[in-house]
Amino acid sequence: MAPPGGILFLLLLPVAAAQVTSGSCSGCGPLSLPLLAGLVAADAVVSLLIVVGVFVCGRPRSRPTQEDGKIYINMPGRG
């Protein structure tokens, strides 16, 4: 169940949104289309690099044990 403060916040959110006038961004400049496209492309590239890094670091590796070089009489397949 949601805490009472969270419910109050959700109820007052539309009231707060109505108080904000559109275009009241202080110090914000308009984003040009090439800049916006570059930001989206850079975000996609960084996201792909993160996915590849997680895949490379997270995949299981088969490591040979130290006993692979030893030959035992009662172990078929090793010798």
Curated annotation (Swiss-Prot):
Instruction: From the UniProt annotation, give the residues forming the signal peptide.
Output: 1-18
Q: Report the membrane topology from the UniProt record.
A: Single-pass type I membrane protein
Instruction: Name the segments for region: GRB2 binding site.
Output: 72-74
Side Extracellular, residues: 19-35
The segment annotated PIK3R1 binding site runs over 72-75
Annotated transmembrane regions: 36-56
Post-translational modifications reported in the UniProt record: Phosphorylated; PIK3R1 and GRB2 associate specifically with tyrosine-phosphorylated HCST.
- In this UniProt entry, the residues modified to Phosphotyrosine are Y72
Q: What is its subcellular localisation? A: Membrane
Molecular function terms from GO:
phosphatidylinositol 3-kinase binding; signaling receptor binding
Tissue localization of expression is: Expressed predominantly in lymphohematopoietic tissues.
Q: Which residues lie on this side of the membrane: Cytoplasmic?
A: 57-79
Please name the GO terms of the biological process aspect recorded for this protein, alphabetically. Answer: positive regulation of phosphatidylinositol 3-kinase/protein kinase B signal transduction; regulation of immune response
GO cellular component assignments: cell surface; membrane
Keywords, in A-Z order: Disulfide bond, Glycoprotein, Membrane, Phosphoprotein, Signal, Transmembrane, Transmembrane helix
Note the subunit structure: Homodimer; Disulfide-linked. Heterohexamer composed of four subunits of HCST/DAP10 and two subunits of KLRK1. Interacts (via transmembrane domain) with KLRK1 (via transmembrane domain); the interaction is required for KLRK1 NK cell surface and induces NK cell-mediated cytotoxicity. Interacts with PIK3R1 and GRB2. Interacts with CLEC5A. Forms an CLEC5A/TYROBP/HCST trimolecular complex depending almost solely on TYROBP. Interacts with KLRK1. Interacts with CD300H.
According to its UniProt record, which protein family does this protein belong to?
Belongs to the DAP10 family.
What is its biological role?
Answer: Transmembrane adapter protein which associates with KLRK1 to form an activation receptor KLRK1-HCST in lymphoid and myeloid cells; this receptor plays a major role in triggering cytotoxicity against target cells expressing cell surface ligands such as MHC class I chain-related MICA and MICB, and UL16-binding proteins (ULBPs); these ligands are up-regulated by stress conditions and pathological state such as viral infection and tumor transformation. Functions as a docking site for PI3-kinase PIK3R1 and GRB2.
Q: This protein is called what? A: Hematopoietic cell signal transducer
Tell me which species this is from.
Sus scrofa (Pig)
